[in-house]
Amino acid sequence: ELTDMLRGSCIQSTRSCDPNPSIKLIKEAIKSGKKFKMISVDDFPDDGIVVAVQGIGGGGPWEYVIDRTKSQGLKVLPDSERNNMVVDLISEFLGKEVTAIIRSEAAEATATALLVAAERNIPILDAGITGRAVPEVQQSIPWISGIASIPTAIVSPWGDEIIIKHAIDEYRVEDISRAIAVA
């Protein structure tokens, strides 16, 4: 079923997506004893906390930032470590454990959500915050439905931790997040 989900997610993404690396990661996780559990939105508790773990594409740190951090010997953390740091950061900020992970978009982000959920031994929610991709935060299904993304937790490639606890609207969440992504 997971293989089918990852293949279908690549079809849904409508871009050049090779599901095989994601399938390999999921199979390795299963071999190492990880369990995958998916729950329906109907089974999600009203007081539960769900987190979408995602990256910010369309750029990245400015070249001089990359050069400087290399000269400082700063280590770039693996995505898996940063993804789990985001979940810990939001959980710590809210004072509650995260109940489930939700995928942020199709393609590789589906595998990311599955792996974070399995690593934490929590379910993935059978849903997503976008249909295909996340061009910008204010174009996500939750915001269109009146659900804000605040608070937002961000972990930089080097492990800096940032919480956006208040923003005027999702447009500002997008602006602030993009500014952090290039810093």
Regions found by a protein language model. Give the residues of each.
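Non-transmembrane, aqueous-exposed alpha-helical and coiled segments at domain scale
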Residues: 1-183
